[in-house]
Amino acid sequence: AESQQYRDFFCGVDDTMAGQTAAKAFIDHFPDGATIVEVGGQAGHDAQIKRHDGFVTGIEGSKITLLDSQNCSGWVTADAMAIMEDFIVKYGDKIQGVFCHWDNGATGIIEALKNAGMNDVYLVAVDGCRAGYDQVKAGTQSVSIGQSFTNMAIQSLKCAQAKLAGQTFEAVNFIPLDVVTKENVETLPYPEW
């Protein structure tokens, strides 16, 4: 959305909002507070920065304590698993929750938690891809903050039609995020990716 001078419109997600939505999931689940860790995406990537910033501002003033945060060198599942293994060694049972910047990274975190026998950790990740939906269905991931590409495409077509017809339209269109849980995963369209 920052490079608006290069396009007629933007239809996509607000990664800051994704971080804030993840923070709200933790606050809602742990009203009395909790200690959590964050496994970030590719260090320096726009989505990583905004998801982290949204998350940190989202938990500010709450009873959620961020024990540690570490970014990956890339959006690599094995990197997320290695970081989580290090967090487990360092913090052990103090970890009540994990915020991961992407669902496929959560796959590695789930494996690390399973190997450590830590079955009651509340795991929230972003993307809403097949891995996230499947992990939520299986109960190994608590929440997936879903990006609806269907809704992005629909809004993009509406903007393109308005542009071609000479009508006015919003230049920046942030698409609402889906909070995917075990309770609602079956009611949402299964992702193509």
Residue positions per predicted region:
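A residue-level marker of the well-folded mature domains of exported/periplasmic proteins
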Residues: 1-193
